[in-house]
Structure formats: structure tokens, C-alpha cells
């Protein structure tokens, strides 16, 4: 087992109200964000409108696809989680390394989760040229506002709430809950994020991982024959393991200490009253109750730099859209062309499996260029199926 890393402990005084808010969001947001493969993130410091973490969208509280602001306590709603790779841009606008859409129905206490591959080829909401690029470029182009609108166009659903998180904090939380247990599918190694000269080795079978090890376990892709799909399975293991660890009596008792480990670098438009509603509705929620959806598709290489894109399968994407629309009890207004006119996919695209269950997270293959490429002709591309029947 890899060498353990001592984690710096930050002690902060928190008000009773803020402690309650951390209690609300930890089980809900923490587990959802870890599986994305962000490589890590920081949890909410608070969801109070007066707190610096609160940041409204330019559009206001209502999605442009809704007639009125959704009541999270009574009506189905959606949240977009964005893992931002600011670490690579030294605090400047990074790309959304991970995008997770969660839809929740408070009446039936159900939850659906969809991870959008970061290399998905779409037209950005702010683009007027008709060209397409990777969906993860939306954040660097127009921040959270453009990302939210781009995802709305792509999935043809309203995005009511958002949360952005950076990559730090993941290890602290894993360590604070006492580590997690995973079933390693095969032997492999991955470099440590602490020291690039250090390798962390994983052996097939049951392993107990600390934060540094769990981060490496979640990020490795190149040694996995199944590529992103194999990595997605490992990330799902982390999700389930963390949810279960967080639900244990011992960890619930020290939830505030855990929250301190992941208390910074978060922005959200979820208010305190809405957070309280989430606690009441989803208390006792476990990983087994999360219905995960996946987007299937194919590899696409375009342009002079042979840039990689993920091209969604049109049939599968439509099924995913309908599933989310039904869960939100939302019907797109096709008369105005608001939804689907710039959904970012080519109707001619095709791939393998169109199953809508399973977990698909970020397509992490980086192309040599992220520039827009408006070409949609198959004569200028090479496609290879990336779908897996298990998804």
C-alpha cells in the first residue's frame, strides 16, 4: 500500500448555522462530486446568501426555460455541479474538468445523476458562428453563466441551481472519514499529486485507500484498457464507498470537523432555506438510491491538429433528455425553438450501446487543441466506438 500523507489541519470557528449547512450538504454534494473524477474538490463553506460562497447567475434565480422560479421543497429541480481546473491556470478561469447534472424530485424522494463527458462536442451558448468545440471550454469562455446555458441547450432541460468547486480538498475529506475501501480491478500505478517523482501502486483485490491514494485511483486512465469507462467504474466505487462512510454513525458525529476540511473555494446559488429543504427531503439517502444515467457515443478527431472530441449518439442522447425531462416534469417549448436548436450534436452521429443506466463521467482524453472546429463532415474525421454494453 502506498505511503500515507500527513494532511494539514485547518481549524476554523463556525457558527451553529453554518455547521447545520455543512451537515446538509456534505452527504449530498460531497459524494456526488467525488465520483466525477475531478481529481478532488472543495465542499461548500456555506449556502447563505450573505456568505461569499453565494453567487447568483446573471439571469437571476429563474432559468430562462422556466416560467417561474422553481420551489425546491415542492417541485422537481436540477443542479449542475462544475469541477473547475483552476489549479492549471493559477487561479484564472480554467475549464470545467467535470460536469454533473443532478435532478431531484422532492415529492418522491428520487435522484438522477448524469455526468457529461468533458470533451463532448457542442455549440457553446455564447457562440454566434455556428462552430462547435468541447463543452468544457464554456467555463473559460463565459464562466458559470455560459456553462449553465450551454448545458441547458445540450440536454434541453432547465438548470435551476449550480455549484462550482475546485480540485483541492478531496484528500482531506477522505482522510477525515478514515479512508475508503475499494476493489481494485487490476494492478496499476499512478503518480502522486504531491510529488510527481512518487508512484502509488495498486494491487488487484481489496484495498483501503487514504486521500492521496484515492485521488490517484480516481484519476488514472492510460493504464486501463477500457479507458474512460474503466476509470468511470473506479470513480463510482469511490462514490459508493464515500457515501457509505459518510453515513456511518462515527462520521456523522464529527461532520463539522469533516466540513472544515472542505470548506473553501466553492460558489453556488443555493440559499440557506433551500439547503435546509434538501436536508429534510434527502436525510438518510444512500448511494443505492441514485439512478445514474450515461451518454454513449464515439470518438471523433477533427482539424489539422487531429483534435479529439466525444460525439454523443443521437438516439441515446434523446433518451437521456426525455428521462431527465420526465423526472423534472418539464416539457420543452418547441414552438419557440428554445430547446434543441443548438443542442451541440449532429443528427447523423452514431455509436454502439444506447443504454441509459450506469455511470459515465468525464471523457478525459485531452486533444492537442481546444479551438473551435465547425466541421461536421465525417470525411474530415476518424471515429472509434467508445461505448460499452455495460453502460
From Swiss-Prot:
Keywords: Cell membrane, Cell wall biogenesis/degradation, Membrane, Signal-anchor, Transferase, Transmembrane, Transmembrane helix
Sequence ranges on the Extracellular membrane side: 45-391
Recorded metabolic or biological pathway in which this protein acts: Cell wall biogenesis
EC category: transferase
GO BP, sorted A to Z: cell wall organization
Region span, Disordered: 329-391
GO molecular function: transferase activity
Compositional bias segments (type: Low complexity): 333-391
Residue ranges of the TM segments: 24-44
Major site of localization recorded for this protein: membrane
Cytoplasmic face residues: 1-23
Matching PANTHER family: POLYISOPRENYL-TEICHOIC ACID--PEPTIDOGLYCAN TEICHOIC ACID TRANSFERASE TAGU, POLYISOPRENYL-TEICHOIC ACID--PEPTIDOGLYCAN TEICHOIC ACID TRANSFERASE TAGV
Function: May catalyze the final step in cell wall teichoic acid biosynthesis, the transfer of the anionic cell wall polymers (APs) from their lipid-linked precursor to the cell wall peptidoglycan (PG).
NCBIfam families: lytR_cpsA_psr (TIGR00350)
UniProt protein name: Polyisoprenyl-teichoic acid--peptidoglycan teichoic acid transferase TagV
Species this protein is from: Bacillus subtilis (strain 168)
Name of the gene encoding the protein in the UniProt record: tagV
